Structures are given as C-alpha cells and as structure tokens.
A protein has these predicted regions:
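Active-site-adjacent structural elements in folded domains
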Residues: 139-142, 312, 360, 414-426, ...
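Catalytic alpha/beta core of large soluble enzyme barrels
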Residues: 214, 363-365, 405, 409-410, ...
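Long, structured ligand/cofactor-binding scaffold of large enzymes
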Residues: 76-219
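Short, Gly/Pro- and small/polar-rich lid/capping loops
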Residues: 17-27, 518-532, 699-750
Length: 775
C-alpha cells in the first residue's frame, strides 16, 4: 500500500453542522451516577496469606459483582496504589473516560450544540455504568490519564524484502508490545530460503527471521509487562518456505516433550519453556480460493518465488499440503488458516491496498500499517423479561458507543507515524458484542441450532447496519474518511452485500420478528444514506474475544462463545468464594415453562453433580439448550463453525474464535473443518485439539514454591488416592478455594480449585479464556 502522509488532527473536514444526540437512558438535570446504589468494598486477588493485589475501600455499584470489583480495581483504576492520586471509585474511572471523550468531541466540533455534547456524555456514562458496553482495555488504561493516549489494541504491520525493513519490523513490534498491545504481519514478501541473494549466496527465509522476532517478543514480555506480547505471523500458501512455516511450531513441540521428559520445568515461565522457539506468535497460512479448489479437486499446487515471481520447485499435491497443515495443527494447534479470497471480497478499501494480515486474534483485518480500537456490547443487557430483544435500547447504545469510538481516533497516539496516518485516514473501528451464549440459553434456544444461528445473525446484522448508519450520519457532519473517495464504488458495493445478506436470514430461524425486521431496516437506511454522504469509517465491526472487559461487564460468556460450563465460582464480598449454577440456567428453565419448585430442584441437582444430565423433571428435548463448550454435552466443532458462518456476513472484520476439538479428533477431522469453514464463508479459523500442547501453564505457584519433600508427599497422596475405590464426598456449600492465572499460547485464563474442610481439593473449574492483543 502506498505510504500515506501524516495527517493533521485539525482542522477536520466538515460538511454539516455537527451531530444531534437524543436522550434515551438519562434525564436532564439528573446525573447517571445518581441512578444506582453504591457501596464500599475491598478488592483482593490471591489466596490465603499470599495476596497479589489488594485495595481497600473501593466504591462500586451494588449491582456489580465482586469478580468485577477485583478485576476493575486491579486492571483499570489508575494512579499509584496506596497514593492519594489512586482512583478508588467507578465514578472516577467512568467519569475520566466518558468526560475525556466528550471533551474531545466538543473540541473537534462533533456536536451541533452544547446540549448535544452534554447529552452524549450522560448517555455514554449511563451505558458504561450499567455494564451495557465497554471499550477495549487501552481506553480504560490511558484515556484521561495520558495527554495523548494509546487507545487501540489491534495493529497490523508490513515488511519488505530488505534487511532494513526486517529490522524496522522488529522495532515497530517492540513499541507495540511495550504498550501492552499486539500486532500481526504477513511475511510473504521476504524471499524464500532457497532463493538467491543479489550479492551471492542464499537467503535466510522468513522462518529464520521469525526466530529472532519471537525471541525479541519473549524478552519484552518478560520485561515487567503484565500482558504477554501477542503476535500473528502470516505466510501465503504459495510461498517457497510454506512447508517450513507449517511445521516450525510442531517441531518445537517435539523439543518441548523431550525437555519435559528430561525433568525441565515446562510451565509458561519455566526455563525449559523459555528455550522453545516460536511460542509468542499465532501462525496462520493464507489460502486462496484457487488453492482450496485445488484441494477439493485433488490438483497440484505450485510454489512461487518471491524474487522472480515464477514457479520454484516441483508442484505439490494440494491435498498433501492441506494434510500437512492439519497434521501440524493436530500436533500443536498451529497453524490456523486465513481465507484470503473471502477476506478481500468483503474489503471496503481495495483501491488503497489489499488485506494481507490480521491482528493476533484474527478479528481485525484491514490494510497494512493500520490500527483499530474496539468496544463490545453486553447482549444480556438488551434482553427484556419476556425474552424479546430490546431493539430501541440496543440501537441507541450502538449509536452512542460507535460515536465514542469514532471520536477517539484522531486524538489518540499510535506506535508509528505511518500507523497513525492510516488510522486517521481510514478510521477503522471494531464494535462487537459479548454474552451471546448466555442470551441464547436464557431464551431457551440451543447454541447449535437454526434458531440460535438465526438470532445471532439478526443481532450481528442489526449491530453492523446501525453502526454504518451512524458512520454515514457522522460523514454528513464531519466528512467521510479521507480514503473514501478513491474507494467509493467498492465500499458501497460491500455495503450492498451486507444488506443483501440480511435478507438471506430465514424468517423461520429468528423467532423475534421485530429484531430481524430492524436488522434489515438498518441496512436499507445505511445503504441509502451512505451512497449520498459516504461513510466516516472504512470498517465498523469485528467479534473480539472480549477477555478482561467481559469481567468488567459481568458477562457469563465471552464474544461469540457459548457458555463454558454450567457451574462457576462466585467471589463473595468480604472474601472467599462459592460455587453457583450459572444465572442463565434458571432463566432458561423459566423460559421453557418450568415452575419455581422444578427450577429449584434442577439448580440444586446441577450444583451437586456439575451437570444437568439426569436432573429431575427435565425433559430430554430441552437438554440441547444447556449444551456448553466442554463436558458431557459439549457442542460439536461443526456447531461452532456454523455459528461463525451465520454471523460472518454481517461483520466488517472477522471473528476471533478458537474451535475446540476433542483429543480423539483425527488429522482428517481437522482438514475437513478447514474445508467446511471455507465453504461457510468464514474468514479465519484456528483449531485446538485437546491435549495437543506439551507446554501448558497449569503448574500452580503453590506447587512451584513447595519444597521437594512436599512435592513427594503430594505425589504419594495422589498415588494412594488412585489406588482406592472412588468414593463421593459432598462439597460444602461454601468452601475455601485457590485461584491461579495461567497462559497457554498467549491465551490467558484462571483455574480455581475448591477445597473440603480438611484442605483437600474437591473440584476444579476453568474460567473462560481471554486472548491478549484485542481487549
């Protein structure tokens, strides 16, 4: 892509008189903070006497959980802990963010009147306060705290086939990692290891340079940052070194297994794991329509030299190459696949440059050297008591949040001048949602069903249609994005593709007729207005993993994911934890027509047994409603793929989602999944087969700190327990527990062990895993 000159923050190009903002959630003269009940709490993370974080006397809305209290106080309250400048109230945090964004909007002429600006600030404050939506983490970290804050979590870089460019790539990544964000890059311009250099000899090849970049990322990760360096490395399927790329991480897994067997510490921070290469990046192969057709038709595939652009080496059977991709993923969960033709078919700005790569989690895909700031809506906040979707509230929340994201673009800072220029020239935004799985379950709709997919498609279509309608309205007031003029025809064509896709959602698959009607109407309005005014933003929506911000919003499920399990841990105010049945289970039972007594019996059964199978009075036909990601009734991988296929046509970007497969899955199963995703129109897919990673960070701090004698005692106790006939011991209703944070391949989560009165472990829970680099 041509390098875009640095644009000035002022003046903005304006074609109107600013935007009007209507009141919906708030009342003039009443501050949103007065609409909730507040209470003082202590925020604490740790177990026993070992405390990793504690802040006493923090102020939170009474409706926010203790889980949210702990995470928000630790992650998002700004200022030195223990100092007078340290934030201690959600009022300070939300006021800092909403107030700063509103002031930026005032300064840059976004609002028609002062009253509109005040209304915007009040409505945004209400939305954030009531956990209806949340920005990505860098906004909470930096807005209102730094003069020119870094607000984006997603970056895409580029590299040329020169040593200068390769070294510059490493420098740019380092700057991004230092800020706690992630980046992606396509290395396909770098010549292959079998190609010649101008001054003689052969090239190192991209995989060799990946080794150095991975070490650099690992070093920065261990330099005191709380977020791991997050990377995506992409290579085109016709690159001469594609097979070396496919196998590079799988071969390192063999090394990891050997080190583990030799007694080395292979936990995520262990010295053994630190010597394993390529572990700081997700790898993806870029495949074209032509390659996938060659696989389907059992044709040969030719690799192409980077220097001459001519065939290099002998042709390879396309199916063999696909099998190698699947086998490597079977062994180590890498590489994933990105479907290049599909991605660029939906590209709004192809005349400015093609889409070559993505951010680390694969949801943001746009031109090289660009950025995206994210926000997510909490779908459960738009569920009415009767289960219908509150279209009016959702539309208004989209309007306010999308405008806030747009305002953020210009005053933000960026890691390089070129990224800043492109961010302001294209103004890419990434609105998404969380709690889809909880919403469907609460409505008695199975995740893996036509009704589940139809509902999700309608919600996604409404979100993106409404976002682009807002983008067109902002373009009327502020002007379209700088590169819109050269992309007018393709951008408008993609908008019509989105609109047409909304009419392909079967009416029978969405029981909420008002929701589907609103989705189609939003696209009609967005297309009609946008073709007259243009659009302010080249991209509007993605589906991010929503990691940490899902805790801020008290979500039961993250991103597009189904519920992880039916039983979870609840943090208690004042300390301690207790196991509870997901709050969506009683809602689902109520929706399905069960009475209070039956609901109480089913909930008690689930709490005791950890499964709903066999619960009293529960009809077999209702079991699919309670299918979750893992366990006895786990959703099949095709159920996950079909959900992605149903929602993908309504997103500017893509979907961050790792499709889990059981340990028994075969290489052929994985290859078939890659083919199925292509046929479904999905833009990217990553697969994780249970047990495929040797180095997994499930070793607890307590184990690490235990002396050898204690380790021996533990192993002896485990051996004795295994030798005995199993006997059930009922867990106490309230019990002590230990929670440990872990990371697998850059994806972080929490494992919690609940204990009996004597301190022995009686149950283990794994929370939803969030991914770094996006939220």
């Amino acid at each position: 892509m041509d390098q875009i000159p640095q644009t000035q923050l002022e003046p903005e190009v304006r074609t109107g008189e600013g935007l009007s903002v209507r009141r919906f959630f708030t009342t003039p003269g009443e501050h949103p903070f007065d609409s909730v009940e507040w209470e003082m709490r202590d925020a604490r993370i740790g177990h026993g006497d070992k405390v990793s974080f504690e802040q006493q006397g923090v102020e939170f809305p009474k409706s926010w959980s203790q889980n949210a209290t702990n995470i928000v106080a630790q992650k998002y309250f700004r200022g030195q802990l223990g100092s007078p400048t340290r934030e201690h109230s959600v009022q300070q945090m939300i006021g800092r963010v909403a107030g700063t964004i509103a002031d930026w909007g005032r300064d840059r002429g976004y609002f028609a009147t002062d009253d509109d600006a005040d209304t915007f600030e009040a409505e945004l404050t209400h939305i954030l306060l009531h956990q209806m939506a949340a920005f990505n983490s860098p906004v909470w970290f930096n807005v209102g705290f730094e003069e020119s804050p870094q607000c984006s979590a997603c970056f895409i870089l580029s590299v040329e086939d020169t040593m200068e460019s390769i070294l510059e790539w490493n420098t740019k990544e380092g700057m991004i990692f230092r800020g706690g964000s992630g980046s992606g890059i396509n290395l396909s311009k770098i010549r292959g290891s079998m190609e010649s250099l101008a001054k003689g000899g052969t090239a190192s090849g991209p995989v060799s340079f990946m080794r150095g970049a991975d070490a650099w990322a690992g070093t920065i990760k261990s330099g005191g940052k709380t977020r791991r360096a997050a990377k995506m490395v992409v290579l085109d399927v016709d690159h001469p070194d594609i097979r070396e790329f496919i196998w590079c991480k799988a071969k390192e897994e063999d090394k990891a297994a050997a080190l583990r067997d030799a007694g080395f510490d292979m936990s995520i921070d262990g010295e053994g794991f630190f010597s394993i290469q390529y572990q700081n990046a997700n790898n993806s192969v870029r495949v074209t329509e032509r390659f996938m057709q060659a696989v389907e038709n059992d044709e040969e595939w030719q690799l192409i030299g980077r220097v001459t652009g001519t065939p290099i080496g002998d042709p390879i059977p396309a199916r063999q190459l696909m099998r190698e991709i699947a086998e490597a993923a079977w062994r180590c969960a890498d590489p994933g696949i990105q479907y290049d033709t599909t991605i660029n078919q939906w590209h709004t700005s192809p005349n400015s440059g093609r889409i070559n790569a993505s951010n680390p989690c694969s949801e943001y895909m746009h031109v090289d050297n660009s950025a995206c700031n994210l926000a997510s809506l909490n779908l459960m906040k738009f569920r009415r008591p009767d289960g219908t979707f509150d279209v009016a509230s959702f539309e208004h929340a989209v309007d306010v949040m999308f405008l806030a994201q747009e305002i953020i673009v210009s005053p933000s800072s960026y890691p390089t001048e070129q990224i800043g220029a492109n961010a302001r020239a294209f103004r890419q935004l990434g609105m998404g949602y969380a709690n889809l799985g909880a919403y469907l379950m609460a409505n008695g709709v199975p995740y893996d069903s036509d009704a589940g997919r139809g509902t999700a498609a309608a919600i996604t279509a409404l979100m993106t249609g409404r976002a682009y309608l807002g983008s067109a309205r902002t373009a009327a007031a502020m002007g379209p994005y700088d590169r819109y003029a050269e992309n007018r025809d393709p951008h408008n064509a993609v908008m019509r593709m989105h609109r047409d896709a909304s009419y392909a959602i079967p009416d029978s698959a969405c029981s909420d007729a008002d929701l589907l009607s609103a989705a189609r109407r939003s696209w009609e309005e967005a297309v009609e207005l946008g073709e007259r005014t243009g659009y302010r933003n080249a991209q509007a929506t993605v589906l991010a993993p929503t990691g940490t911000i899902s805790f801020l919003m008290d979500c039961d499920t993250t991103g597009i994911e189904p519920d992880f399990s039916l039983v979870k841990f609840k943090e208690l105010v004042g300390g301690g934890q207790m196991t509870i049945v997901n709050r969506t289970v009683p809602l689902a039972l109520q929706t399905l027509g069960y009475n209070d007594e039956q609901i109480e019996q089913v909930v008690a059964y689930v709490n005791e047994h950890g499964t709903i199978v066999g619960a009293p009075d529960l009809a077999d036909e209702h079991l699919p409603v309670f299918d979750v990601a893992v366990g006895e009734r786990a959703i099949s991988h095709m159920g996950h793929l079909k959900m992605m296929g149903a929602t993908q046509p309504f997103l500017s970007g893509a979907i961050s989602k790792t499709v889990n497969m059981p340990e028994s899955a075969t290489v052929e199963d994985i290859a078939d999944a890659y083919l199925a995703a292509w046929r479904l129109g999905i833009k990217a897919l990553a697969i994780y087969r249970d047990g495929s990673k040797t180095a997994q960070a499930l070793r607890t701090d307590a184990q690490k700190d235990a002396p050898a004698s204690k380790e021996a005692e533990i192993q002896k106790a485990v051996a004795e327990a295994l030798a005995k006939t199993p006997q059930r011991r009922r867990m106490p209703r309230e019990r002590r527990s230990i929670t440990h944070k872990f990371s697998i391949g850059g994806h972080e989560g929490y494992i919690t062990a609940g204990m009996y009165e004597d301190g022995t472990v009686g149950e283990i829970f794994l929370t939803d895993i969030g991914k770094e680099g996006s939220t």
